[in-house]
């Protein structure tokens, strides 16, 4: 699939959206961002945690990424097991028996120049979208995400529902502060906290106005 799609792993990264095991990107010799290792540093852990990636002290992985982090970290290719439907603006450029392959045309190469105002950026905060907004302000002088509070409905003990309205072409994310939910279902697709950041959810983007049920 890599060869047939002409994947460039010299200038760009490739990530697996829904891995089955830790370090699966390494297993497939992908130049990804996920890692499970006792050599992980505190500085790296702080970075991926604040940016929204799924993480613990000795690991981090792609889950929790956004279009912004894909762009900034040069993630041009996404492999998604075809047991899951990916609602994305990225173009599907290949498929195999197990994976669909998507390409992100806005991914930046390994090195690029930014305003020196980024040196004043403080990597702090608990809301990944606000952290990314501040980082973008330091890089380009602009904020990207429009923030709003959404209400939830308690269905039964320990369970809440959200209904989030997205306009056509709008990419939605939902941040749930506090204790990470063990299981989340987004429009019928279930994800466990072991391999996903269930505090920070990618709601996808759609061709028509859509209500996403979480």
Residue spans of the language-model regions?
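Short beta-strand-plus-loop segments that form exposed binding edges in beta-rich domains
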Residues: 214
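Soluble catalytic regions of membrane-associated enzymes that act on cell-envelope
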Residues: 1-197, 203-207
